[in-house]
A protein has these predicted regions:
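Short, flexible active-site-proximal loops enriched in glycine and acidic residues
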Residues: 112-113, 134-135, 333, 349-358
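Long, low-complexity, intrinsically disordered segments
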Residues: 607-620
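A conserved beta-strand-loop-helix scaffold within acyl/acetyltransferase catalytic domains
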Residues: 84-91, 248-303, 307, 330-331, ...
Length: 620
């Protein structure tokens, strides 16, 4: 099997090489070995980055290491001294630019490939002109040959220069001219006497190493000329950074939220499908528009929410398209909270997977609070009813400014108790402007709202998933249990098949791994997740949330993190955490540090209340 895969990957590369276009990005065809081809190209890019880094190091060393008198004498006999000095300065710029291009090469940017090809050849010329170094020049010519042979490994698009980015360039030129003219005026007696126009020309040409810099009569004047060259080098670096910004592809925009939710409702088979349509997420259209995948891109990692959602039979094509799209944009493809079926299918593509949590799903056909396994649930419900808690749906026709204000008050207090802003990604937020996309239930005491929940549909309207779960700090014990139970009973009476209470990260890590399910998973990663589950209560109360949802006697469905075999798991874990944070990342982290150790008043029995902290998958 491995030989057939390798042969398929080689055939794919050979077909790509035979394409006539030379500098245009090569399209990666949709195929079963899409991930295999991506991994092969990634390994080749790593070798390219190593080779480029060696040349960049040689460039910097060749530019800054002092030359001996004998070396200078040889240079003076063969080259004008000004040309030699200019070559050394350009060599430094070339080395710095190559280092800047290294990250773009690793991501597969075509622009980075073109730039590296040019700069390595230029480095060879500059090593000859600046230092007459035949060894370094020969070394610099090796990477461009290798880059040319693996040109099909660079298919990613960098973001086109925007108007805002282009406007930065005149500011740099203007600042350079202003700085140069003011400095020349201050040092007029120590610099050559030139006209105003000649000064402008000399400043620009000197800054970008297009001519020999004018000499100065004093050390201060010579330092001023060197500062112009540093300014020019910095400008080139900024321009290179602007050219290599990653693409941010929003193929489905926030304005499409309503249509996106309806599509995910129709074709979604798991609760995560509904969360993929939350307004802050972007979406990729895969399999010729037949499949939708909600995602967020953070630092070059595209994190898909759950499974790709679409018509049956499109799973293979959708996964191949996801890999291809990510490679074209320089992203690492990842699926967060994918189902067991998707994880199995992805492993056949060459992905790795590890169980990271479980989803609590309640079968509604025979749901009731009767029986021993839901005895604790009955007790909490009776207690809440004795305290006067009344539960009802809150529909668009019933909306009032008073109730809306009370919902906002509860949500604001909940945020204050957890010392942070609203999170996002797979966590919903209270947005009354999109009220009709949710089904909302409220709990009242004496006509005042003390808690509420929101639900999102999936399975073509035959199932719902719990999104927001928020309560007032003085809500009676058992309020949340009663609120959820009455919602579930209503869903059952309306003929719905199931209701997801959402996922619990880390909930499965203390259970044995099913035979063959995660043969490739890193045991050290599972050990780390298990430790976090056992000791991470200060950060995320997974155990409390698991105990709370267990009272509903759900069935537990595993959720997986699916990632390429060669991916950096530490980087993926970091980007997943950042995906949940809004723009105020610093404020969120500061809030976690300042979190009050005293928990809010319980809404249930002290040993089984839902945690007050938000969690990936459920805002409780």
């Amino acid at each position: 099997m491995a030989r057939r895969r390798d042969a398929g990957g080689r055939n794919l590369i050979e077909r790509l090489r035979r394409r006539p276009a030379l500098l245009a990005p090569r399209a990666v065809p949709r195929a079963d070995n899409a991930l295999l081809g991506m991994e092969q190209r990634r390994r080749r890019r790593r070798w390219a980055v190593l080779a480029i880094s060696v040349v960049a190091f040689a460039d910097v060393v060749g530019a800054v290491v002092p030359r001996t008198r004998g070396h200078l004498a040889i240079l003076e006999r063969n080259f004008p001294l000004g040309l030699s000095e200019g070559g050394r300065a350009l060599l430094l710029v070339a080395g710095l630019l190559l280092l800047l291009l290294a990250r773009g090469l690793a991501r597969g940017y075509r622009r980075a490939w073109v730039g590296a090809l040019f700069l390595t050849v230029a480095s060879a010329v500059l090593h000859l002109a600046g230092n007459l170094d035949l060894i370094a020049a020969g070394l610099a010519l090796v990477p461009p040959v290798y880059l040319w042979t693996i040109r099909d490994a660079f298919v990613a698009h960098a973001r086109p220069l925007t108007v805002r980015s282009v406007l930065v360039i005149p500011w740099f030129f203007g600042g350079l001219l202003l700085y140069g003219l003011v400095g020349w005026s201050e040092l007029a007696e120590q610099l050559p006497n030139r006209s105003f126009g000649a000064r402008i020309s000399t400043i620009l040409r000197s800054a970008f190493f297009l001519t020999t810099a004018p000499g100065g009569d004093t050390a201060l004047a010579r330092a001023f000329i060197r500062s112009l060259q540093l300014f020019g080098a910095a400008s080139l670096l900024v321009l290179a950074a602007l050219l290599l910004q990653p693409v941010v592809a929003r193929l489905t925009h926030h304005a499409d939220t309503g249509a996106r939710v309806r599509f995910l409702d129709k074709w979604g088979r798991t609760g995560m499908a509904a969360l993929a349509g939350l307004p802050e997420n972007d979406a990729l259209e895969l399999a010729d528009g037949k499949v939708l995948l909600g995602y967020r891109e953070i630092s070059g990692v595209a994190i898909g929410v759950g499974d790709p959602v679409g018509e049956p039979g499109t799973e293979q094509q959708a996964l191949g398209d996801f890999v291809t799209t990510c490679e074209r944009h320089g992203w690492t493809p990842v699926l967060l909270a994918a189902s067991h079926a998707t994880a199995e299918h992805a492993r056949r593509f060459g992905f790795e997977s590890v169980a990271i949590g479980e989803e609590a799903v309640v079968d509604l056909q025979d749901f009731s609070t009767a029986g021993k396994e839901r005895a604790k649930l009955r007790q909490n419900n009776h207690r809440a009813e004795r305290d006067g808690v009344v539960v009802m749906p809150y529909r668009s026709a019933d909306r009032t400014p008073t109730v809306d204000a009370q919902l906002r008050e509860i949500s604001d207090e909940w945020l204050r108790l957890k010392h942070g802003p609203e999170l996002g990604f797979t966590l919903g937020r209270l947005d009354l402007d999109t009220f009709d996309l949710y089904e909302t239930w409220i709990a009242l005491v004496g006509g005042r709202v003390v808690a509420f929940t929101t639900w999102l549909p999936y399975l073509d309207g035959k199932a719902v998933i719990l999104d927001l779960v928020r309560r007032h700090s003085d809500s009676p014990v058992g309020t949340m249990e009663l609120l959820i139970v009455r919602s579930l009973e209503s869903f059952r009476d309306r003929g719905l098949k199931e209701a997801s209470l959402n996922g619990i990260p880390l909930a499965c890590v203390d259970r044995p791994v099913p035979e063959g399910a995660e043969a490739e998973a890193d045991s050290r990663l599972r050990d780390a997740l298990r430790w976090l589950y056992d000791h991470g209560g200060a950060v995320y109360e997974a155990k409390n949330l698991f105990r709370f949802k267990s009272k509903f006697a759900p069935r537990w469905e595993p959720m997986y993190l699916v990632y390429p075999e060669s991916a950096n798991l530490a980087r993926i874990a970091t980007t997943v955490g950042l995906a949940y944070l809004p723009n105020g990342v610093v404020a969120t982290l500061r809030g976690l540090v300042r979190r009050d150790r005293k928990p809010p008043p319980p809404c249930s029995a002290p040993d089984s209340s839902p945690p007050s902290a938000g969690a990936p998958g459920t805002s409780t």
